[in-house]
């Protein structure tokens, strides 16, 4: 069974840091592109970070809203994807999801999602 399980969320003050984890199972993490997506309190989904697969040396990409503050990485030996979040702001408050990328025909899509972990940034 393919599973993604996020953890590491919580309450943090503005300017603080958190590291989210996404434990993966049922597939080989190094073979897949992986993504982080968040859902704001207004229910808007926002893509924030990508980690490409081993073929592309696990290179990363970020949305403008988090670039320079968030870092995505992975530990393939433990099958865990990470999101290091620094200089957190109130607008980073959201439910954070990891997702696996899949390719079908000419379309990329997220075929597996975790249940999410909640991050609240407030003083």
From Swiss-Prot:
Q: Which organism is it from?
A: Mus musculus
Q: What's any one GO cellular component for it?
A: extracellular region
PROSITE patterns given for it? IG_LIKE
A Pfam family per the record = V-set
Q: Which UniProt keywords apply?
A: Adaptive immunity, Hybridoma, Immunity, Immunoglobulin
Sorted alphabetically, which SMART domains does this protein's record hold? IG, IGv
- What superkingdom does the record give? Eukaryota
All copies of the Ig-like domain together span: 1-114
Supply the SUPFAM superfamilies for this chain: Immunoglobulin (SSF48726)
- Which biological process, per GO, is one annotated for this protein? immunoglobulin mediated immune response
- What would be an example GO MF term here? antigen binding
Q: What else is known?
A: This chain was isolated from a myeloma protein that binds phosphorylcholine.
Q: What is this protein called?
A: Ig heavy chain V region HPCG13
């Amino acid at each position: 069974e393919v599973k993604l399980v996020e953890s590491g969320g919580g309450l943090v003050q503005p300017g603080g840091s958190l590291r989210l984890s996404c434990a993966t199972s049922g597939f080989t993490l190094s073979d897949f592109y992986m993504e982080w997506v968040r859902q704001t309190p207004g229910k808007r989904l926002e893509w924030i970070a990508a980690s490409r697969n081993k073929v592309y040396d696990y290179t990363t990409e970020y949305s403008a809203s988090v670039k320079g503050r968030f870092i995505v990485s992975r530990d393939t030996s433990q099958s865990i994807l990470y999101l290091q979040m620094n200089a957190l702001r109130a607008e980073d408050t959201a439910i954070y999801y990891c997702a696996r990328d899949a390719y079908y025909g000419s379309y990329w899509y997220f075929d597996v999602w975790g249940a999410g972990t909640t991050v609240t940034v407030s003083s």
